[in-house]
Amino acid sequence: MEKIWLKQYEKGVPAEINIDEYTSLVQLFNESCKKFQTSTAYTNMGTSMSYGELDALSLKFAIYLQQLGLKPGARVAIMLPNLLQYPVALFGILRAGYIIVNTNPLYTSDELAYQMTDSGAEVLVVLANFAATVESALPKMPTVKHIVITQL
């Protein structure tokens, strides 16, 4: 099978990664951010983010999450479509030492409440467009202590 996505890789980005070189996904992420600091990491809706920007923003988000006083291994849910905020949240959660709970932004309030309760998520990161669903589900999500709302 032809790996057509490789044509999109910038010069110097390896086609394969030796996973034995890294002790964790966070280590791989940190080293990639340093190595490709000025390269584009993500592009969405006409806006690009470099690895350096992703590094800085995800670190700030990790610090914010830790300042909430969550214990190591706490669950943090992400209720976002494919936006630049998603990788910032994802890598911020990992860097803080927490567990990611991906959730569907199109869930009904009952589906969301079930997943949050079942997973034990304490934090929910959500796009403002879906805040009404969260508000409706909130009484049925006793584990959720913090909600982080982002905008388009």
Q: Could you say what each language-model-derived stretch is?
A:
Residues 1-22:
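Flexible, non-catalytic linker and terminal segments flanking ANL/adenylate-forming cores
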Residues 3-6, 27-50:
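AMP-dependent adenylate-forming
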Residues 17-21, 53, 101-103:
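Short, flexible loop segments at the rims of nucleotide/cofactor-binding pockets, characterized by
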Residues 21, 38-83, 87-91, 108-113:
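Conserved AMP-binding/adenylate-forming core of the ANL superfamily
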Residues 24, 28-29, 61, 111, ...:
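Hydrophobic alpha-helical segments typical of transmembrane helices
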Residues 25-26, 43-44, 76, 94, ...:
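Conserved, well-structured beta-alpha core segment at the onset of a catalytic domain
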Residues 27, 56, 60-63, 95, ...:
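Generic recognition of well-ordered alpha-helical segments
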Residues 67-68, 95-152:
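Structural core segment of the AMP-binding/adenylate-forming
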